[in-house]
């Protein structure tokens, strides 16, 4: 029997975990030495590469000194917390990767806490020691303190630390003596991480993730915790509420390098993919057909936020996208539910709308961005935070927020957070930067990032994670400025935009097509302002030729999808099409808005 090590990678966004796995893959000669290291092998989804975040957990396996090492790459963002917990169930130890300059960040803490609670043994890798002014030794102390505060056992606190630079491709026990490759890390994995326990008996495999193939449908992935599985074997699927179904395994695959290899039998402790089992959910157990024993189901974080998805019914609908009907959107959301655990979907008030529940703005905006790239057109409402009633009291989700800013911007950062009902817990100087910790309601985080970056000239680093439900903190003032709303459908003309520059700032370029009811800018005052920017200049003979000035407009404010979701008000929607993002009023007609009581002023 081949020896196995199952290991999960934990790291903060952008601390280099995907690069490290790529290095391990080269070390095991699975890929010939690359011409361009920039292409991350694991983040194989466009959005992941663009944003530099891992969303879905991936599995890769390398063989070193005859031992098979299964590496499971976990997402670092607590918005994808549903992914993290399942993945840790497959691992026997964890590789904690920290940046030698930044140290431990809240996201790392989130995953590490889950891993320590499950009793996994850690190895700490201090990465990026090639960075100028890094502080590897201090970071190692920080990790120790963090583990103490997370109630780690003495055995877990006696962890091994390896220093190195994944980018340059070396690891070493001492950061002052670089080596030529990453073998010290692989040796440490073999020495420190326990092999999975071999348990004789009837098979038990808990489905911890799933893959989808257009040919064979849904594939169950999990770690075989007891017994062995064979191709063609009859098994039971133990679902929630003691439901048991009989199935036959059509095909078994284990992870081999970057792909999968078909096998006839899977030994205990290995991670495998099972084909031929229909209708399984994450957390179900594949067990013996005669006397099935189920493993306890996996708990997944509850959603903290909801958003309304509806069909695109703006005047420009169907111009960009391939999929525009409510049936297309429903089918796509149902498909997403199969693989995205922390997501829930309920029907909306009318047939064309759906309420989608998720873990945060990032979680939901990644879904919207994926749909947009696939050719969908849809409209999305303002994100709403979910309240709970606990002991008769209205409670709301509170997040643990940490902000790192240069010293001169500390005042601005504290003011922004406290204005949104944030409570400053402690601040600690780190060189010329300061780390601030707050407890803040989830609704206070909406739009905070963009304001914070503006206030700190782009220098702030912000991270947050869900902490607990606490009593409602009271109203938070949202954006104070009204919108500039178009009165006409047509083309935006530079001449009329120039005349309205003193009224606010624009979100669109001259020459863009706009429609009546579209939000084209931000008003300088509180109320909305209805404006006509489709007026052209009358070219009659009356005016003197010399008195014309060239129109110079300041560049428009361009927002990303997340910024738009955080910016819109209750009576506005974001229209998402493959090539455009627009903001609009729910009621396009100014007279309808007047009747409903939030009409705005007319220009």
PLM feature spans:
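Long insertion/accessory domains within large nucleic-acid-processing enzymes
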Residues: 255, 260-263, 395, 440, ...
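Canonical P-loop GTPase G-domain recognition
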Residues: 121, 131-191
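Conserved nucleotide-binding/hydrolysis micro-motifs of P-loop NTPases
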Residues: 15, 31, 77-78, 101-104, ...
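Charged, conformationally dynamic linker/hinge segments
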Residues: 292, 300-432, 443-445
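Conserved nucleotide-binding/hydrolysis modules and their immediate coupling elements
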Residues: 204-307, 317-319, 481, 490-540, ...
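Active-site phosphate-binding and catalytic loops of NTP-dependent enzymes
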Residues: 30-57, 80, 146-158, 190-203, ...
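A glycine-rich phosphate-binding loop feature that marks nucleotide/adenosyl-phosphate handling sites
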Residues: 159-167, 202-211, 347-358, 384-390, ...
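P-loop NTPase switch module centered on the Walker A-proximal segment
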Residues: 1-98, 102, 142, 210-213
